[in-house]
Amino acid sequence: MTQKKNILFRVSGGRAFNKELGLGHVYRAINLALELKPTNIFFLVEDYGNVKSLLLNWGFKNIFLLKGGIKISSDITETTKLLYKKKIDILIVDKYDYNTKKYVKRMHKIVKTVVVPDLEKIDYDADLVVNGFIGFDNTILTNRYGAKCLLGPKYQILNKKYQNRKFTNQKKYTILATFGGFDEHNIVPVFCKQLTKYLDRITAKIILGPATKKSKELKNLEEKFRGKIKIISATKNMKKEIS
């Protein structure tokens, strides 16, 4: 009987101000982890708030936490301990800061390492780089360190629900507004204030994001315009919301 692989995701995310972080890295890791089952999945998370609860909600239980803003030396130490303790076969890194390249280089000496970066970043000393940045042509190449790179929208990591291209065409709301994982700049109240001017003609659904709290102001607004505006914290099926 073939033994299951042990895969560790190192991600960062949550309610982090002035870091442009949110939950994008976490959701991408979740989408990939769901496709990698029935392997043994572990998460090592630099949690700025709400990440652990989100992972638990998706059914993941092997979650280990790091403090937000952890120093690179401590990050490497804690990751290394976990690699050996859980006998990790593959490390998948989906985080971005100025220390990520140094972190990946160190980890690559210990374990097979995959990096999932953003924008035009590809030069990591790893085994595999997966970058679905829309600005890349779909291609496979080797970077300066000899790592295989899967580039372009073809390799974007999305929830498998998007593989079904059928749409329901049953629109309940005129407008659907989503603010990612975390509304760092508090745009939702401003948006809602303007939206109320047009609720005699439209209906709207707003998805705050798992790391954004539903304030008393928003609850009152939803109650005042019941049937015209619906505000939820999150969804597990964004395709269903937009189709």
Named regions from a protein language model:
Residues F9-E20, R28-E35, E46-F60, F64-Y145, ...:
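Active-site and donor-binding regions of nucleotide-sugar-utilizing enzymes
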Residues N40, K61-F64, K112, T203, ...:
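Conserved beta-strand segments of alpha/beta enzyme cores
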Residues V111-P117, I157-Q163, K230-A234:
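Short gly/ser/thr-rich secondary-structure transition/capping motifs
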Residues Q170-S243:
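Donor-nucleotide binding loops and adjacent catalytic segments primarily
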